[in-house]
Amino acid sequence: MSVDLATVKRVAHLARIAVNEDEAQRMVGELNGMLGFVEQLSEVNVDGVEAMTSVTPMAMKKRTDEVTDGSKAADIVANAPNTDQNFFLVPKVVE
């Protein structure tokens, strides 16, 4: 895949970026270079390579999933103008 001048101008317009003719021409070469690098990456054989999310192996600490009220219901509704049993009361908007 390659990028032409019209594509650069269209992307700049969609991104609301002001680009003059010289900058757009320079970006054509830069974007084509980036796309060429991505195409090289897609040619690499990664069969059998385990996916990784970090360069260092680590595992997230697990905790039990407990349902609680958070013990902050009163603090949350403290500044609300209308409440009832720790629920916000709002005006009816749909009949």
Curated annotation (Swiss-Prot):
Q: Which reaction does it catalyse?
A: L-glutamyl-tRNA(Gln) + L-glutamine + ATP + H2O = L-glutaminyl-tRNA(Gln) + L-glutamate + ADP + phosphate + H(+); L-aspartyl-tRNA(Asn) + L-glutamine + ATP + H2O = L-asparaginyl-tRNA(Asn) + L-glutamate + ADP + phosphate + 2 H(+)
User: SUPFAM superfamilies, per this entry?
Assistant: Glu-tRNAGln amidotransferase C subunit
The enzyme's first-digit EC class, named in words, is: ligase
Q: Name one Pfam family in it.
A: GatC
The source's domain of life comes to Bacteria
What are its E.C. numbers? 6.3.5.-
The record's annotation in InterPro entries points to: Asp/Glu-ADT_sf_sub_c, GatC
Its subunit composition reads: Heterotrimer of A, B and C subunits.
What family does this belong to? Belongs to the GatC family.
According to its UniProt entry, the function of this protein is described as: Allows the formation of correctly charged Asn-tRNA(Asn) or Gln-tRNA(Gln) through the transamidation of misacylated Asp-tRNA(Asn) or Glu-tRNA(Gln) in organisms which lack either or both of asparaginyl-tRNA or glutaminyl-tRNA synthetases. The reaction takes place in the presence of glutamine and ATP through an activated phospho-Asp-tRNA(Asn) or phospho-Glu-tRNA(Gln).
Protein name, per record? Aspartyl/glutamyl-tRNA(Asn/Gln) amidotransferase subunit C
Gene responsible for this protein: gatC
